[in-house]
């Protein structure tokens, strides 16, 4: 096997998982693959350990964010790809254990124009799904049952399980570096993290890359040991596992920001099939002309359209300016250019007219699913449905304009 990988592995204050992950790569895959680490302004000794390890292991490259703010893996993945010296990169979480032959099985399928994922084995901290194996071999490195895991992997790969590959994607995933760079890598819109993976997966599909998951190469994934569940996991007296506390405030706030930005960019929520292959509705140019739109309703509606038109006179104008000022801090989209007076004639391909006072949780779902609805039954012309009046002059779509991210 002459192909070699550059493992792309940022880390932030999760040193014990990073050590565990590093040891598995070197023990089970050897020293032939490069490991690229980035310390994201940690205060738990991560940088010192990285530097010391790099002195002993010459196939490691390290870099550091000096702070004072975190950059997040959205940015650091791409910075590490830039310094990687191999033709093949693998996006790899710091809480993943590489099982023997994982690299061989991934590389067996890898060609240019393909993105290949290993299969995750995870403890039951999240709902089960057909794209992974839910089996408990430990929730912390201290209790990790390595020998039982390795026995399970040997038996699983020997058995006829009905599939060698499926079509989908989740970390760890590998591809040629030049394919990654051709679409501009991750979009910094989502920095420091959350939804950057769903965004780039959409762009892989739109660029024509094949998404392959091998069911003969495995990692054991502790899951979410960064900012989301920063305090780790526990067992209750019955042995069931759960995360300590709840998702961190930092993660919850950033996930909301990234979700709103994903909707602004794509016009819909994240969608995928049961094997995690992206489902990508068309992107339309949509304008909302909204009667009785106050600031609270503006916050709900603005991400779902290209432009929004309303009556912003008087106190509404003050609220509008406040909304733009606050929301602009959380996005690279120019919010001020999206919001217009209702005296301005809408310029969008698809225009929806409605009264915000008549919106309910039920009919709001039409806006959430608008891309699917227009794809299935949209026609040029005028129509009415529920509280909405449609004025459709074109059903051109723009999702392919989102493939390349200019860095």
Regions found by a protein language model. Give the residues of each.
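A recurrent flexible, glycine/aromatic-enriched loop bordering the glycosyltransferase active site
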Residues: 75, 153-178
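Short aromatic/hydrophobic "clamp" motif used to bind/position activated sugar donors
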Residues: 89
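A short, conserved alpha-helix in the catalytic core of glycosyltransferases
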Residues: 167-184, 190-218, 223-224
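Short, acidic, metal-binding catalytic loop of nucleotide-sugar glycosyltransferases
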Residues: 23-32, 300-307
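A conserved hydrophobic helix/loop-capping motif in glycosyltransferases and polysaccharide synthases
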Residues: 5-21, 28-29, 38, 109, ...
């Amino acid at each position: 096997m002459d192909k070699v990988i550059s493992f792309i592995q940022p880390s932030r204050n999760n040193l014990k998982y990073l050590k565990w992950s590093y040891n598995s790569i070197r023990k089970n895959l050897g020293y032939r693959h490069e490991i690229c680490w980035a310390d994201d302004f940690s205060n738990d000794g991560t940088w010192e350990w990285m530097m010391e390890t790099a002195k002993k292991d010459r196939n490691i490259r390290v870099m550091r964010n000096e702070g004072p703010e975190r950059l997040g893996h959205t940015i650091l993945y791409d910075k590490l790809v830039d310094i990687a010296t191999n033709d093949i990169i693998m996006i790899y979480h710091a809480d993943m254990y590489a099982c023997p032959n994982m690299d061989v099985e991934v590389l067996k399928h890898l060609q240019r124009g393909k993105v290949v994922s290993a299969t995750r084995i995870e403890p039951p901290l999240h709902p089960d799904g057909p794209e992974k194996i839910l089996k408990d071999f430990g929730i912390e490195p201290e209790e990790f049952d390595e020998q039982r895991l390795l026995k399970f992997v040997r038996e699983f790969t020997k058995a006829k399980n009905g599939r060698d590959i499926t079509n989908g994607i989740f970390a760890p995933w590998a591809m040629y570096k030049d394919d990654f760079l051709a679409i501009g890598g991750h979009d910094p819109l989502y920095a420091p993290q959350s939804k950057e993976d769903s965004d780039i997966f959409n762009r892989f599909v739109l660029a024509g890359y094949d998404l392959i998951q091998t069911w003969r190469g495995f990692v054991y994934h502790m899951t979410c040991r960064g900012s989301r569940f920063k305090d780790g996991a526990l067992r209750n007296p019955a042995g069931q596992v759960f995360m300590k506390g709840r998702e961190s405030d930092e993660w919850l706030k950033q996930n909301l920001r990234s979700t709103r930005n994903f909707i602004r960019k794509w016009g819909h929520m994240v969608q995928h099939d049961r094997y995690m292959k992206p489902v990508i509705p068309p992107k339309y140019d949509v304008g909302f002309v909204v009667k009785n739109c106050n600031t609270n309703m503006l916050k709900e509606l603005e991400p779902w359209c290209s432009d929004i038109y309303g009556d912003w006179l008087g106190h509404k104008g003050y609220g509008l300016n406040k909304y733009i000022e606050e929301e602009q801090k959380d996005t690279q989209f120019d919010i001020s250019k999206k919001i217009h007076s209702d005296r301005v004639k809408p310029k969008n391909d698809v225009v929806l007219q409605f009264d915000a006072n008549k919106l309910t949780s039920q009919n709001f779902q039409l806006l959430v699913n608008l891309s699917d609805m227009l794809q299935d039954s949209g026609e040029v012309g005028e129509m009415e449905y529920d509280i909405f009046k449609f004025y459709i002059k074109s059903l051109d779509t723009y999702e392919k304009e989102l493939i390349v991210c200019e860095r």
